[in-house]
Curated annotation (Swiss-Prot):
This is NADPH dehydrogenase. Substrate binds at Y28, H164, A165, A166, H167. GO terms for molecular function: FMN binding; NADP binding; NADPH dehydrogenase activity. It catalyses: A + NADPH + H(+) = AH2 + NADP(+). It is an enzyme of class 1 (oxidoreductase). It comes from Bacillus subtilis (strain 168). Forms a charge transfer complex with a variety of phenolic compounds. InterPro entries: Aldolase_TIM, NADPH_DH_bac, OxRdtase_FMN_N, YqjM-like. Belongs to the NADH:flavin oxidoreductase/NADH oxidase family. NamA subfamily. Homotetramer. Composed of a dimer of active dimers. One of its GO terms (biological process) is response to toxic substance.
Amino acid sequence: MARKLFTPITIKDMTLKNRIVMSPMCMYSSHEKDGKLTPFHMAHYISRAIGQVGLIIVEASAVNPQGRITDQDLGIWSDEHIEGFAKLTEQVKEQGSKIGIQLAHAGRKAELEGDIFAPSAIAFDEQSATPVEMSAEKVKETVQEFKQAAARAKEAGFDVIEIHAAHGYLIHEFLSPLSNHRTDEYGGSPENRYRFLREIIDEVKQVWDGPLFVRVSASDYTDKGLDIADHIGFAKWMKEQGVDLIDCSSGALVHADINVFPGYQVSFAEKIREQADMATGAVGMITDGSMAEEILQNGRADLIFIGRELLRDPFFARTAAKQLNTEIPAPVQYERGW
């Protein structure tokens, strides 16, 4: 039987050499606080391309300075960010990998000086600052910031854009009734709470014609929060809008007890794939080749997003291939040690 983990897949006009995706993970290493890449970021991402990851998604990159989680996050709110990202995309592609970027706004979870913004003036928790409720004008302005960031991503040479609509950040805050108490067109019904994301997708697609992913938190793990049924509905709308894949994570909107175990989020990817007829990515405690292969062989997801395991092992692709008794090509420079 062919090992599906190492079978190419084409999404829109992009072909990945395998189904392994480096999940976006914040490194909090833009130490000049200007949102720019550092030598660390270059080494971090290029090393995973050398390690034969099919698709590398750069960590959450803020569309606005006040949309960072911390002041050491990456940003793509300025044309000054394009040059650094262009150098990174060129180097990653030289190693045969594709590269994406996650466009993000932290919303009420921003830990920054000055005002932070959210759909409603509801703090994340008792230790967090209370955000300013966004005016309708501010909402429209933020939608345009996502569009402008997407245009910069295209200029920088990225292959994929992922919109971050998960983990309790701004878009997730609009989607969930726990954090969105608005009474205007952006609050109330599921259609209204989805409107912010709908407008972002529509605007991004005006300047971006490549593969478009959206990361979601498929469960809030708490009463009256979002659950998988809600996200199946959202996924159907995303498909209508031309989103190519949903990256299925969960949680982090509110503090909640989560039963974490290997592959604990895979069922979300499976259900969205089946019930919304949508390509999905599985993520969360997927740590070996056999687990990844099972998910793919059983049609539970289309891509495997690997996070912490790629921090521990930049050569996860090689490790997984050995676990599956298959061979993958080595970088020419590494052939004698592969």
